[in-house]
């Protein structure tokens, strides 16, 4: 009988601890990101260390995009506004350029300004080789980025990625159509 009670207590403790490990996100992905240091829209170094201790939302865009990047960026702006309205602090937004040769810091600054981006917590990143962003996106965000040899349009995913304070991707959401803004805000709050 004592053995059975001890087993039940142990099981309950394991379940409780495993739930804590998910940081309040059900079925958290826990994809750990590798360190990075790139260049932001202000031509300053910006990297994972700058995001340490903060929850952040990432996406992959480029300024020359003819279709999906415009609505994605508009949706990220909506998310930034909603987070501010909800009084959420310690939240950052990161847009990785998938066309770094074209997307200089100046070009990214102009692009973000067209959407009234608040650059105090929204960082548009460049300053890496095309191959590097393609590999980083695949290895750590499990998404494709591919610039064809001909043409100027880059193939890339359209998801938003929620990253926790330790640099782990916890969840992803559509960033294009019918974006679940309320769910993302709820999940951001659950991580804080």
Q: What would you call each of these model-derived segments?
A:
Residues 33-34, 55-56, 157-159:
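Short loop/turn microsegments at loop-to-beta-strand junctions
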Residues 22-49, 74-75:
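N-terminal "domain-start" segment that seeds a small globular fold
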Residues 148-192:
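Thiol-/selenol-based redox modules, centered on thioredoxin-like
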Residues 74-136:
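Structural microenvironment flanking redox-active thiols in thiol-disulfide oxidoreductases
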Residues 122, 134, 141-146, 155-161:
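Structural micro-motif
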Residues 48-70, 76:
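Short active-site neighborhood of thiol/selenol oxidoreductases, capturing the structured segment around
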Residues 15-19:
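C-terminal motif of bacterial Sec signal peptides marking the signal peptidase cleavage site
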Residues 1-9:
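Bacterial N-terminal signal peptides that target proteins for export
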């Amino acid at each position: 009988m004592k053995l059975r009670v001890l087993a039940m207590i142990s099981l309950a403790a394991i379940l409780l601890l495993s739930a804590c490990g998910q940081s309040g996100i059900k079925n958290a992905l826990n994809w750990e990101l590798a360190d990075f240091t790139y260049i932001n829209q202000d031509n300053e170094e910006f990297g994972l260390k700058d995001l340490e201790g903060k929850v952040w939302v990432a996406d992959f865009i480029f300024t020359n995009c003819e279709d999906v990047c415009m609505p994605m960026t508009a949706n990220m702006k909506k998310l930034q506004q909603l987070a501010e309205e909800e009084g959420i602090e310690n939240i950052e937004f990161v847009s990785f350029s998938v066309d770094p040769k074209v997307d200089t810091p100046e070009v990214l600054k102009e692009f973000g300004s067209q959407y009234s981006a608040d650059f105090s917590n929204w960082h548009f990143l460049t300053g890496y080789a095309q191959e590097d962003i393609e590999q980083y996106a695949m290895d750590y965000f499990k998404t494709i980025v591919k610039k064809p040899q001909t043409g100027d349009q880059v193939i890339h995913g359209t998801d938003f990625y929620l990253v926790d304070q330790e640099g782990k991707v916890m969840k992803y959401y559509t960033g294009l159509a019918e974006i679940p803004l309320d769910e993302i805000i709820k999940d951001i709050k659950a991580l804080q």
